Amino acid sequence: MNRYVLEGIIRDAQAGKRILCVVPSREVQHIIDQLESASGIALLRRSHGDERVLFTSGGGITFAHARREAMRGHSADIVVIDDVYYLDQMFRLHADLKVIVAAASGEIITYT
């Protein structure tokens, strides 16, 4: 995840937004390492498969793999997808992720 995307999701989470990052599991710990220094963190969880960062504002960043079962039960204001990893699955992913952001009238953001 590049620093511009990271800065944006930190600001949104600090502002109370719920963000779901769809990234490969091998990237999650690296991203969390970069998030550690952000201000306003209430909880930083590194448990494999349950990684998340919650902010005092009520916002947070959770992580999921692109498998359907990994995304079940999530709701978010913003979904961020690294399309380099999931370009071949993008059509299916957008269909699955629309359900996650539907309740909040949120947005899906892809980046390379």
Each language-model region and where it sits:
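Short, flexible loop motifs at catalytic/binding sites
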Residues: 1-112
